[in-house]
Amino acid sequence: MTTKLFGTDGIRGKANEYPITPEITLRIGQAISRVLRSSGANHNRVIIGKDTRISGYMLETALTSGLVSSGMDVFLVGPMPTPAVAHLTKSMGCGAGIMLTASHNPYEDNGLKIFGPDGFKLSDDLEALVEQEVLYDVKANGVTGDKIGKAYRIDDARGRYIEFVKQSLGNAHLDGMKI
């Protein structure tokens, strides 16, 4: 097993091979929950988005299981651009946002990009804590009963992001512009 999970922009690799396996992804979810709580974050909500890679469904399920088993509520927004997940993390008051994507890497790959409550990349210090918990197999203190988190599908996430983008343009006109 490697001693490093995070690269320059999250965790990436070939889907269903270490570290992008359901088992490790579940542990990442549990670790994120513990790190958020120990950092004093008063958030028990996490948003998860993904790109259209087939492995996204497998990883989304594992990640959700890790988070809800640790008491986090999860908002699933489905296929969404990475900047949308960053924006929704902040605008929905979530403690973290996680994008399941390997960006420009081959379709067989996948990865996790984690945002803090401000909608920016998780700090290096918090990434290091998540990494330690996963690599050193820190045992999860699962919650029981009504402390177990819930998972929700957010059907209007795309519309929320589109409205944000339109508002950010102000009165700018795109007449005559071509792509």
Language model feature labels by segment:
Residues 1, 14, 110-179:
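Gly/Ser/Thr-enriched, mixed-charge loops and adjacent short helices
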Residues 1-19:
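N-terminal amphipathic/basic leader segments beginning at the initiator methionine
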Residues 5, 18-26, 30, 57, ...:
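Electropositive phosphate-/nucleotide-binding environments in soluble metabolic enzymes
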Residues 9, 85, 165:
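A residue-level signal for conserved active-site and pocket-lining positions in enzyme catalytic cores
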Residues 14-26, 45, 49-52:
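Short, N-terminal intrinsically disordered low-complexity segments that are rich in Pro/Gly
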Residues 29-46, 169-175:
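Glycine-rich phosphate/diphosphate-binding loops that line cofactor/substrate pockets in enzymes
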Residues 30-34, 38, 65, 69, ...:
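A generic structural signal for well-ordered alpha-helical segments enriched in polar/charged residues
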Residues 33, 41-118:
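Ferredoxin-reductase
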